[in-house]
Amino acid sequence: MKKKRRLFIRTGILLVLICALGYTIYNAVFAGKESISEGSDAPNFVLEDTNGKRIELSDLKGKGVFLNFWGTWCEPCKKEFPYMANQYKHFKSQGVEIVAVNVGESKIAVHNFMKSYGVNFPVVLDTDRQVLDAYDVSPLPTTFLINPEGKVVKVVTGTMTESMIHDYMNLIKPGETSG
């Protein structure tokens, strides 16, 4: 009878320890990660473009920033790029900047993509995916609309039409009431 009781107590203690360990791991992986949402400060980052020029998000304060995460293999991303290029021609002079963050690909692959799509805006490389993780991005494409004060005013997941891109750039241009 004593052996059964000891076994029962040991099993109970083991279950409590396993639950505590599981809870600790869950908190470390998921609960500690703050999701970037509307109204949040946009996390600063420094990344290089395909020519090695450093771009820091905080240097763009005072401008609206259309922060787009993408990949060369992503079909919806390919669809958006010509629309983004068209709208950039119009909105750049109004204080809106596009920063397209390529996720985990080589300089050569990104450079070739840029040439074939006639990209006219800054494209930076997040080879180690640190910025992707900081912004908690999933899936691609995901776009963060950042107002001139550095606040995220909208997060858009999935493909955008040219009309949507136009409206979003209007939303974040300096002088507009964007959150």
Curated annotation (Swiss-Prot):
It is found in: Cell membrane. Residues 36-174 form the Thioredoxin domain. The chain crosses the membrane at residues 11-30. InterPro entries: AhpC/TSA (IPR000866), Thiol-dS_OxRdtase_ResA (IPR023555), Thioredoxin-like_sf (IPR036249), Thioredoxin_CS (IPR017937), Thioredoxin_domain (IPR013766), Thioredoxin_ResA/DsbE_sf (IPR050553). Keywords: Cell membrane, Cytochrome c-type biogenesis, Disulfide bond, Membrane, Oxidoreductase, Redox-active center, Signal-anchor, Transmembrane, Transmembrane helix. GO terms for molecular function: antioxidant activity; disulfide oxidoreductase activity. Disulfide bonds join C74-C77. Pathway: Protein modification; cytochrome c assembly. GO terms for biological process: cytochrome complex assembly. It holds the Pfam family AhpC-TSA. It is a single-pass type II membrane protein. The keyword Manganese does not apply. GO terms for cellular component: plasma membrane. HAMAP family: ResA. Thiol-disulfide oxidoreductase which is required in disulfide reduction during c-type cytochrome synthesis. May accept reducing equivalents from CcdA, leading to breakage of disulfide bonds in apocytochrome c; following this reduction heme can be covalently attached. Does not play a role in sporulation. Belongs to the thioredoxin family. ResA subfamily. PANTHER family: THIOL:DISULFIDE INTERCHANGE PROTEIN DSBE. This is Thiol-disulfide oxidoreductase ResA. It comes from Bacillus subtilis (strain 168).
